[in-house]
């Protein structure tokens, strides 16, 4: 999904991975045909930070209407300025209306709701809003260190309580995690597909004292009742076919060089369109420049199999050799 060291090109990578995850979740769980996107579908999640900030943008590229909850308004400001969310509001009513209006028209949108995800889920459930896809990307690897904000606290109150009353903060985190899980189960009963997105949310719920989240009803040795996105979506749809992240960087820092490589990659995939994964990747790289994915150096990520990586590398070498880039 992302990478370390010299392979890391910023959050663009997680946008592509999330785009693929959402599209294929729609196909596997919602019955969407391989040649269609998520138009007319609603995705709800939480988190607009360093990695989680990809969710709204990925949902838009995949064609979905989406609402992403985030308690830190500075994070929302970053994503809004960046163009990775299209709307922002602290009103549950307004956030829901914007998303549902776009969903009804089959148009994509990414609504950043400044508030707690549990408040959002309660509002949607009580107003009988059907959510097609649901996930979570709060920082549940450190829930008691500020990574998960308890319901009823603002972001600023959370920071103050964490400093002055960490034990009390932990109690509120556990209570909110338990209620968060209850709301997910209620949506699941209504047909929502929830998937774990690798942020330790399910483990955090278990650590809060919820044993029913475990497959064996007792402990986490056999895993959890909700699936991981890797085992349930990306594995069978992409990794099992050899598709994975392929990156290149234009060290000239010239956006025109990146544009030319995008065009070359799109032309190659279009000419060698073997399966629906290729079409998805074609759409991704065709629209990559328009979607303003670059952060920093002029780099691109594109899921490819071994054949695609090799042939694109040879094509780029040829372009350098001929002075095209």
Q: Model segments located where?
A:
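Catalytic or ion-translocation cores adjacent to nucleophile or general acid/base/metal-coordination motifs
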Residues: 3-6, 10-20, 39-42, 48-104, ...
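Active-site/ligand-binding-proximal alpha/beta "capping" segment
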Residues: 110-138, 145
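Patatin-like phospholipase A catalytic core
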Residues: 1, 95, 139-142, 146, ...
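A short acidic, amphipathic alpha-helical/loop segment
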Residues: 55-58, 122-124, 183, 315
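A short, basic/flexible loop-to-alpha-helix module at the beginning of a structural domain
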Residues: 18-40
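Short, well-ordered coil/turn segments that N-cap beta-strands
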Residues: 64, 107-109, 192
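General beta-strand structural signal in soluble alpha/beta enzymes
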Residues: 45, 68-69, 111-113, 133-136, ...
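Solvent-exposed alpha-helices and their adjacent loops that cap or buttress functional pockets
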Residues: 32-38, 60, 77-78, 101-106, ...
């Amino acid at each position: 999904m992302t990478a370390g060291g010299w392979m890391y090109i910023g959050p663009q990578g997680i946008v592509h991975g999330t785009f693929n995850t959402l599209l294929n979740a729609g196909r596997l769980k919602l019955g969407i045909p391989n040649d269609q996107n998520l138009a007319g579908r609603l995705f709800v999640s939480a988190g607009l930070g360093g990695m989680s900030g990809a969710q709204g943008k990925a949902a838009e590229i995949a064609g979905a209407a989406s609402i992403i909850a985030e308690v830190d308004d500075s994070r929302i400001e970053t994503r809004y300025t960046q163009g990775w969310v299209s709307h922002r509001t602290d009103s549950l009513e307004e956030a829901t209306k914007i998303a549902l209006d776009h969903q009804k028209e089959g148009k994509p949108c990414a609504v950043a709701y400044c508030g707690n995800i549990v408040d959002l889920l309660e509002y949607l459930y009580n107003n009988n809003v059907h959510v097609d896809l649901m996930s979570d990307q709060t920082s549940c690897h450190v829930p008691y260190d500020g990574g998960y904000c308890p319901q009823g606290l603002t972001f600023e109150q959370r920071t103050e309580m964490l400093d002055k009353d960490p034990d009390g903060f932990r109690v509120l985190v556990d209570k909110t995690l338990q209620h968060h899980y209850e709301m997910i189960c209620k949506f699941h009963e209504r047909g929502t597909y929830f998937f774990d997105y690798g942020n330790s949310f399910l483990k955090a719920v278990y650590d809060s004292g919820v044993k029913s989240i475990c497959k064996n009803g007792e402990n986490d040795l056999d895993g959890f009742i909700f699936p991981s996105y890797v085992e349930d979506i990306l594995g069978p749809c992409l990794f099992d076919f050899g598709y994975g992240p392929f990156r290149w960087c234009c060290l000239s820092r010239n956006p025109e060089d990146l544009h030319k490589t995008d065009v070359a990659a799109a032309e190659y995939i279009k000419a060698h369109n073997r399966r629906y994964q290729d079409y998805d990747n074609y759409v991704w790289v065709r629209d990559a420049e328009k979607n303003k994915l670059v952060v920093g150096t002029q780099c691109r990520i594109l899921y490819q199999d071994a054949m695609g990586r090799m042939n694109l590398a040879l094509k780029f070498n040829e372009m350098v050799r001929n002075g095209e880039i």
